[in-house]
Each structure stands twice: as C-alpha cells, then as structure tokens.
Design a protein with these regions (language model features):
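Short clusters of small/polar residues that mark proteolytic maturation junctions
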Residues: 58, 178-179
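Carbohydrate-binding surfaces of carbohydrate-active enzymes
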Residues: 1-101, 107-109, 114-115, 127-132, ...
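Compositionally biased low-complexity segments at domain edges in trafficked proteins
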Residues: 111-150
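Short, surface-exposed tryptophan/glycine-enriched loops
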Residues: 67-81, 142-150, 185-196
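Terminal leader/tail segments of proteins
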Residues: 156, 186-221
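Aromatic-lined ligand-binding clefts that engage carbohydrates, nucleic acids, or primary amines
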Residues: 33-48, 82, 147-169, 177-178, ...
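Short, positively charged
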Residues: 18-30, 138-152
Length: 221
C-alpha cells in the first residue's frame, strides 16, 4: 500500500508488523554536497539517490551519533529523489530494546529535517502479485525459477553465492538467508512440493550467479 506522510512513520503506524518498508522524498532545488543523516534505522536500510544505491545502514553499527547514521551526499543541481528501503529482521523481546518499531525516524540534510514522504508498505506475504514481465537488473530483485520433484520428500535449497534475502516455494515463504551464516541452506517441507514447482527468491544485495541447488542434505554451517 502507498501512503503520504509529512515525516517517516514506523511499519506499525501503518498496521504492518513484518517485511519491508520504503520511504521516498524529493529534493526540488539545488542542494550542495553535504552529509545526509538517517535516524534510528531498524533494522537494515538501503539508501538510494535517483535509484542508485549509495549506502547500506545496519542498526548494529557502532559509529552512530545520537542515533543517526551519516553518509556523504554529493548534492544535486536540478533536484533528486532519496529513497530508503528498510528490512525488518525480527523482534527484540527483552530488555531496553523491547520497544522495537521498524523503519526510520527521519532523514536530515545537514541539520535540516527533510519533509514530505511517499511510503510503500511491503509485507512480502503476497508473491502471487509480483509482475515478472517487468525488466529487472538492479538489486533488490525478485527472481523466479521452476523445478520438478519426483517425490514429496523433505529437502533443502542451497544458496551459495547469494547474499541476503528470502525464498518462496509455491507461494510459501520458507525463510530468510544471509551470507554471514551460520546456516547455508533453507529447509523445504515435502508437503509443499508438487510435480512442477515454483521458486521465487528476493535478493537484496546481489548474487554471483542466479543458480540454486536443491538436495536432501542440510548445510548448517
């Protein structure tokens, strides 16, 4: 769903509790080179200027200043678009981080709060709505393939060369993967399998080659 808000709001504000959320704001005039600061990222944010990836922000980064992550902005002479895609990676259910709202709180150009955001909520629970007729190329990217299964035995999909994302088998989200490990393969329950099967992968950061291997053996790292 799309929304228009004056300042960034959390996923929960829009009634979303998992998945991803995208914030976009437009700069309509000349902006000199300066630092851009993003406030309170929960959990991973991918920052784009006019569609080009410029920074990745992790909530675990230790070089924050009063909750802000900072990166260099080269400025613009005829306006530009700033986009921030935030990936919610789970919930902290104890201690000081119990109040764990997902998204960002603000984007600042120097000390100026940027105003006016188009927000798209992406719960990632409806892969059947993905339009694969659109031309891809840049990450994040949905990829689709098909495979045959001779039986409904449990198996594992190995994602060597992929970096970070999630996998759907016949429309069912079987889980997330991340190259930092330790897990190197995702479990596919046999009951999900048919004679002809569809696999969809959402890769957020890029992969060496768009190939996976499905075997009967796990890889626990």
């Amino acid at each position: 769903e799309r929304h228009r808000v004056p300042l960034p709001e959390s996923m929960e504000y829009f009634g979303q509790n998992s998945g991803m959320i995208y914030y976009e704001t437009k700069l309509e005039q000349i902006y000199d080179p300066r630092e851009l600061r993003v406030a309170n990222v929960h959990d991973t944010a991918y920052v784009y200027i006019d569609g080009e990836h410029k920074a990745t922000i992790d909530r675990r980064d230790e070089n924050k200043v009063k909750g802000y992550d900072t990166f260099k902005f080269d400025g613009c002479t005829d306006g530009c678009t700033i986009g921030v895609l935030v990936d919610a990676m789970g919930r902290v259910n104890y201690g000081e981080h119990l109040y764990d709202r997902k998204g960002i709180d603000a984007i600042r150009y120097g000390n100026q709060n940027l105003m006016g955001y188009d927000v798209v909520t992406l719960p990632l629970d409806n892969p059947e709505k993905i339009d694969f007729s659109l031309e891809g190329g840049k990450y994040p990217l949905f990829m689709r393939g098909h495979f045959k299964a001779q039986s409904q035995n449990d198996c594992f999909v190995h994602l060597d060369g992929f970096k970070k994302g999630c996998v759907y088998i016949n429309g069912f989200n079987i889980g997330r993967y991340w190259e930092i490990g330790p897990q190197r393969a995702l479990y596919i329950p046999g009951v999900l399998l048919k004679d002809e099967n569809e696999i969809i992968i959402l890769e957020l950061e890029g992969c060496e080659k768009a190939e996976v291997e499905i075997t009967a053996e796990p890889d626990l790292g």
